Regions:
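A membrane-cytosol interface segment of integral membrane proteins
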Residues: 160-195
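Membrane-embedded catalytic scaffold of the fatty acid hydroxylase/desaturase
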Residues: 14-169
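Juxtamembrane/interfacial segments at transmembrane-helix boundaries in multi-pass membrane proteins
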Residues: 1-21
Length: 195
């Protein structure tokens, strides 16, 4: 809010239905890129990895959220700079997050044509799998169309069941260590880097 006010950005009307729809779609695209970079940039993976460490895939997996995501907000700055009110962005982000809770399940197999447009349990199982063919796929939060557009979509194959977790398993159930391990490992790697 303060940054936008300081730049003199005019706030758009929060009572506009069109604004809510456009913000929902735009937020989905920005979430896709945040999530994709969250897997590809080590500094962001350090914040996100705890969510992927579970070797079980159920609703409790959705609750494994990080306590160290300090830079993810940067991806949503375009919405603020476009004049979208903070309450609209937070509301849309909350809807996105609530929706994602329900896709962390093995109890729903496939849901027809919706598999093409929405992130479904099947699409998201692929995202959580550590099978080589599934790694770094299906980053969308609500819409799977972003993965289809940007080339990261992978369909769940019935003859290749998902194996969950990260490629280098943590080997601990300690939640503090789950949140700090990749940070610690990154620090050790940085010490070995030639200067």
């Amino acid at each position: 809010g303060y940054l936008v006010q300081g730049l003199g950005v005019k706030q758009l009307p929060a009572d506009s239905i069109l604004l809510w729809v456009v913000t929902f779609v735009a937020y989905g695209c920005l979430y896709y890129w945040k999530h994709r970079f969250g897997h590809q940039w080590r500094i962001m993976w350090a914040s996100h990895s705890a969510h992927h460490q579970s070797e079980e895939y159920n609703l409790s997996t959705a609750l494994r959220q990080t306590s160290t995501d300090y830079i993810g907000f940067i991806f949503y700055l375009p919405l603020y700079l476009a004049g979208v009110p903070t309450e609209v962005i937070i509301s849309v982000g909350s809807l996105n997050l609530i929706y994602q809770f329900w896709v962390h399940t093995e109890h729903v197999r496939r849901i027809g044509f919706l598999e093409w447009v929405l992130v479904t349990p099947s699409n998201h199982r692929v995202h959580h799998a550590r099978n080589p063919e599934y790694v770094d796929k299906n980053y969308g939060g609500f819409f799977i169309i972003w993965d289809r557009i940007f080339g990261t979509f992978k369909d769940e194959e019935t003859d290749r069941p998902c194996v969950y977790g990260v490629t280098n398993q943590l080997g601990s159930f300690n939640p503090l260590w789950a949140n700090l391990y990749v940070w610690y490992d990154t620090f050790l790697i940085s010490l070995k880097t030639k200067r």
